[in-house]
Amino acid sequence: MMSETGFIDVKIFPQRLLKPETAEKLLNRIYELEGIVRVLVHGPSIPDRVYYGPARGTEVNHSDRRKITVRGEEFELRVKVGEIIVGMLPETLEEKMETIEEILDEVLPCSYKVFIGAFTKKDITISDYLKYGLKFEEKIDPRVIGMVDPSSRMKDTVVNIK
């Protein structure tokens, strides 16, 4: 993967939430492509415990909250995969779109939509300054710029797969 920030987003929107096995297979196939800058996985969260109500503090044993392996990197999937945003270098976009469509047809058990555009922030935001402080630009990976939540721990929300 490249560490450049001049990229175009490709949003893959399956018509159903993906199971961990399907998400793992799809992510591994996407990461095989050249010119991928970053991949974001979005969807409803799968909590590890009940956070409110009478059962507060009780552990949630959800079968979809489990570890998956992408490019040899194992991490816990904390969301039901509802959309995947792939950041690609502009020069590789046109030639890779057909390959992405073939991968999606092969891996996804449902229909899907693909959108091309700008779906993520690529410039430094106020939230980045709140999270990292002043003069952080040279100290962090440019792929994480614009992806932070100032109140969360980065190790809980971002997995860096190389």
Swiss-Prot record:
InterPro entries: Me_CoM_Rdtase_D
Keyword terms of this UniProt record: Methanogenesis
Pfam families: MCR_D
Biological process, per Gene Ontology: methanogenesis
Assembly and interaction partners: MCR is composed of three subunits: alpha, beta, and gamma. The function of protein D is not known.
Record protein name field: Methyl-coenzyme M reductase II operon protein D
Originating gene: mrtD
